[in-house]
Regions:
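C-terminal functional module detector
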Residues: 1-187
Length: 187
């Protein structure tokens, strides 16, 4: 696998803060970092106030416990993901037959029958390709999700990097158009 790495997000707020969440999000820039000046326009006539600008990237980590050791163990396993602003929940398992996984037994059977995101499938099934179990939750105060995609990356026989994007779940009763594309849901 040429792309064997995990991705996390971290803030891109220009305040020198290591992290931010709702209760301590000071703004994107140092000049909107206190409540007294948060309402002021900071760039020309644009209404770019601190409260209206999203927080930076966020790291999602599937740790067994909320301890330093378990969080770092999840980083090493690459059982992590990144999101920007919205607090989207994502968990993915891969295996050769995950058809018995349901919402209620998702984690138990995911770990038992497959490997979590960031893991390696130990052997190749000659009878079928891998299957995936994916659980996604939108931010409770955010917009509805448009779709879930899996991006398959590989190196071809000529040594060139390739990718294919698969739409695996989407909102509403949309269908693919004649070119095989799915129109965005829009907001």
């Amino acid at each position: 696998n040429p792309y064997k790495f995990g991705l996390i997000g971290s803030t891109d707020s220009h305040t020198s803060l290591a992290s931010a969440e709702e209760k301590n999000f000071w703004g994107k820039y140092s000049n909107d970092s206190t409540p007294e000046i948060k309402d002021q326009d900071i760039i020309g006539d644009a209404n770019n106030t601190g409260w209206s600008m999203s927080a930076g990237g966020l790291a999602g980590v599937w740790a067994k416990e909320n301890t330093r050791d378990e969080i770092y163990a999840a980083f090493k396993r690459k059982e992590v993901y990144a999101t920007t602003g919205p607090r989207i929940g994502v968990q993915v398992f891969a295996g050769w037959d995950l058809s018995d996984i349901t919402y209620k037994n998702f984690q138990d059977l995911g770990y038992k029958l497959g490997v979590p995101m960031g893991g390696d499938l130990s052997s190749i099934s000659k009878n079928s390709g891998p299957s995936f179990a994916i659980k996604v939750a939108k931010d409770p105060i955010g917009a509805n999700l448009d779709r879930v995609q899996i991006v398959k990356g590989w190196i071809d026989r000529d040594g060139k990097s390739r990718e294919k994007i698969y739409d695996v779940a989407w909102s509403d009763d949309r269908d693919f158009d004649s070119s095989g594309q799915l129109e965005p849901v829009g907001n």
